[in-house]
Amino acid sequence: MAQDWQLSELLENLHADVQHKLTTVRKSFKHSVVKGDGAENVWVDLFNQYLPERYRASRAFVVDSENQFSEQIDVVIYDRQYSPFIFHYAEQLIIPAESVYAVFEVKQTLNKQHIDAARKKVASVRALHRTSLPIPHAGGVHSPRELIGIIGGLLTLENELKIPDTLMGHLDHDKADKGMLNIGCAADDCFFYYDNDHQRMQVMQHKKATTAFLFELLSQLQKCGTVPMIDIHAYGKWLTPRISE
């Protein structure tokens, strides 16, 4: 016998669950660092539960083959299927730049200060060097895959910029700017994303903002395709030379 379920109810429950967890974190933890960690964990858990298995979400630093590091990123969505290595050092996760699909700053509220902070974090990742090797196949090799555009965003519980035009004014930015935000969500009010078809930022107020945001993120990840084939030797050159016998 078919279950008496409704898709609308399932999607509503997903949004309500995330908003409830974020609200609980905000009310339960007074220490700002603990509160921040709790909110990050809510978003990381959401992504790891609902994104396809090829993706993994974690708090991390990002590194490139030229020994440059990003700032610490609250949520990094990266490729775990084709990534040849992920570093774990002193309880920190360090991910090669080639493996990154998206990076997010997590805050309690959506406002200009936090938008600027998110831009700075996103730019620190996009500025890193990424390699891309030719891809072997049965008939020869494919040309190196074009580098994907790393998605950058901001995730919050509340929106302090309730007037859409005000929020739009703070979000609008040159696409060439490495700190431009492609997407974001204020769980209690809205989500936003850059609409490539119309070449403009869209702010969408929504009762199920978290679920709507997740669907838009999935769409953007699909358009990214697969990360490039990483040049292992570019990283290996940083190995300390062996002492000659």
From Swiss-Prot:
GO terms for biological process: defense response to virus. CRISPR (clustered regularly interspaced short palindromic repeat) is an adaptive immune system that provides protection against mobile genetic elements (viruses, transposable elements and conjugative plasmids). CRISPR clusters contain spacers, sequences complementary to antecedent mobile elements, and target invading nucleic acids. CRISPR clusters are transcribed and processed into CRISPR RNA (crRNA). This is CRISPR-associated endodeoxyribonuclease NucC. Forms homotrimers and homohexamers; in the presence of cAAA only the homohexamers of face-to-face associated trimers are formed. The 2 cAAA-binding sites are on the exterior of the hexamer at the three-way junction, there are maximally 2 cyclic nucleotides per hexamer. Its EC number is 3.1.-.-. Keywords: Antiviral defense, Endonuclease, Hydrolase, Magnesium, Metal-binding, Nuclease, Nucleotide-binding. Mg(2+) binds at residues 74, 105. Belongs to the NucC endonuclease family. GO terms for molecular function: endonuclease activity; metal ion binding; nucleotide binding. It comes from the Bacteria. The keyword Magnesium applies. It holds the Pfam family DUF6602. InterPro entries: DUF6602. The active site is at 74, 105, 107. The record marks 137, 142 as: Gate loop latch. Its cofactor is Mg(2+). Activated by cAAA and to a lesser extent cAA; cAAA binding promotes hexamerization which is probably necessary for nuclease activation. The record marks 54, 82, 226 as: Binds cAAA. Encoded in a type III-B CRISPR locus. It comes from Vibrio metoecus. Transmembrane segments: none annotated. It is an enzyme of class 3 (hydrolase).
